[in-house]
């Protein structure tokens, strides 16, 4: 993408009185070269440095371009939803699958929906105290078969922290609802077997006919709920 999450993270860290460039190292993979250059330019404009890999080696399904499995303090992502025709053998060889592969077509040897590849990657990148937050298709919260098996294993780790259901029209290019997932491998012991679910599908401010958002006070309300839970 264009690095928007990096920029927002940098702004947040800088606003807290720290220097994002000295406190954090930003890594990214972007298959499309143009998008990678746009990301680097966006970061440079905002005074940030990043290591962004592009091209074939940046295909996350088949490469861990930065060799970051088990090393990340934070993971943030907005991956493409419901990607199909992922080569299962290549994906398996690339690793980062602590809970196994999602469903594979026995005839084509392809993964029909890559949502749980992404979810597995984000978890696999975290170190022992790492935290992740990412956007995911709503269908991933109750998909069946191999997805359900992976989801069960993930929940049993105790590291799933918060799930937020989001309504329609929160993206310029996507009208479907989505979910926000948050992992925390350093949860308080009393929360280890708990997950906070927030149904925010009908909680939004209308921007125009095709776009909704959370206002500043709505965001603060959601943050307060999570803070009280934690």
Annotate each PLM feature.
Residues 1-77, 82-84, 89-93, 136-139, ...:
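Conserved S-adenosyl-L-methionine
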Residues 69-230:
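A conserved structural/catalytic subdomain of Rossmann-like adenosyl-cofactor enzymes
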């Amino acid at each position: 993408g264009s690095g928007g999450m990096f920029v927002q993270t940098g702004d947040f860290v800088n606003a807290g009185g720290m220097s994002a460039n000295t406190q954090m190292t930003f890594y990214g993979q972007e298959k499309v070269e143009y998008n990678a250059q746009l990301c680097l330019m966006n970061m440079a404009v905002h005074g940030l440095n990043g290591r962004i890999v592009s091209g074939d080696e940046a295909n996350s399904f088949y490469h861990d371009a930065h060799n970051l499995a088990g090393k990340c303090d934070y993971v943030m992502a907005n991956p493409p939803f419901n990607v199909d025709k992922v080569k299962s053998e290549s994906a398996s060889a690339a690793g980062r699958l602590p809970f196994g592969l999602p469903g594979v077509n026995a005839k084509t040897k392809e993964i029909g929906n890559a949502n749980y590849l992404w979810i597995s990657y984000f978890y696999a990148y975290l170190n022992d105290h790492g935290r992740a937050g990412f956007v995911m298709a709503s269908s991933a919260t109750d998909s069946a078969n191999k997805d359900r098996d992976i989801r069960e294993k993930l929940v049993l780790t105790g590291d799933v922290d918060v799930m937020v259901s989001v309504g329609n029209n929160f993206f310029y290019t996507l009208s479907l609802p989505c979910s926000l997932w948050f992992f925390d491998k350093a949860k308080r012991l009393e929360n280890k077997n708990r997950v906070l679910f927030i149904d925010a599908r009908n909680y939004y401010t209308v921007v125009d006919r095709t776009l909704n958002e959370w206002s500043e006070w709505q965001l603060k309300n959601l943050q307060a709920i999570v803070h009280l839970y934690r």
